[in-house]
Amino acid sequence: MIHPSAVIDPRAELGANVSVAPYSVIGPDVRIGDGTEIGAHVVLEGRVAIGARCRIGHGAVIGGVPQDFKYREGIPVGVRIGDETVIREHVTIHRATREGMDTRVGDHCLVMATSHIAHDCAVGNHVILINYAGLTGHVVVEDRATVGGLTGVGPFARIGAFAYVGGCSKVNKDIPPFVMAVGTPATARAVNVIGMRRAGIDAASRRAVQSAFRILYLSGLAPATALPRVKGELGQHPLVAQLIAFIEASKLGVISRDRRRGPAEIEETTL
């Protein structure tokens, strides 16, 4: 159902069974997949592609001009959202700044109310952003990561797959896959065993990641010594190899553990 008060440019492409609630505005370069629901007072502007069976909450603004001085009006940039993703009330997602690029949100994500995804971010599949989470420009959030409420993620930071960032944190370095982190700045606290278990990752794989975490964060070794040890002892395991590759690719550096707490105080969830 398209409410008569909605303003939809005739050049916009709406799939089958798309619904648009009152007073929403949809621009000419917008494409919406089958079965997607657009709430009231939503603004979709610029080049926006939304997949099938998504829900866009009241007051969300998607495709807005980025808050970045280097942006130039008229360049071909946009926002791309996958299938079955939920964008809740008053979320803002800004278009990219680099020509030919999109700010991206994957499939099966949940972006809770009033969260912000800035220009050129790349959010993977099955990601959860909790209320008031803020991603600044060029942030990467890999599959199945969770970012807690009121958490700010700094420019170019990366959050690895299955990572869990606690609420009210400040992220200014990369958070490796499978790691739970919290604080200002965020520091490593544990392995996200619960998230891994819920995703069906077997106990042997969880133990391998936990062993790598102990070497990296609980052994007292310097990173330059700990990482080669992880490679030598556990690098043959696919998930540990993923962890190693993420750390080696880091440009900002990865988070450390909280130096105010001894290794015995770092909580380790039962496998």
Residue positions per predicted region:
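Terminal amphipathic alpha-helical/low-complexity segments used for targeting or macromolecular assembly
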Residues: 1-5, 10-11, 16-17, 53, ...
